[in-house]
């Protein structure tokens, strides 16, 4: 797997569980799982703290999928579903989101960002010959 662009942090048990699930989806010698192997029901008890992000390239744009946990939107203060990351204010819990997402996509590896009050894990997922989606999860500190 590629080197991590962000320093590894000890993960909260909830984030460890999401990462373990993500790793369980990896097929054979691939570095990342395919996005269509993801089953939201596998993380149903964590649905409030999980999100999917669609990745578009040329130009790179990130769109919050229809799966964005209620706790995430509550912390942000408004709905972000179906919105592009460059259309929202980069405030908690989306501080440095675009930078972290870019690093996740380029490295094709998990990244962790920690800020006051939360830790965010982004995990790349493959499709159409590139990282086309990311699974995100939050732990509230």
Residue spans of the language-model regions?
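Sensory/regulatory domains in signal-transduction proteins
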Residues: 2-28, 33-141
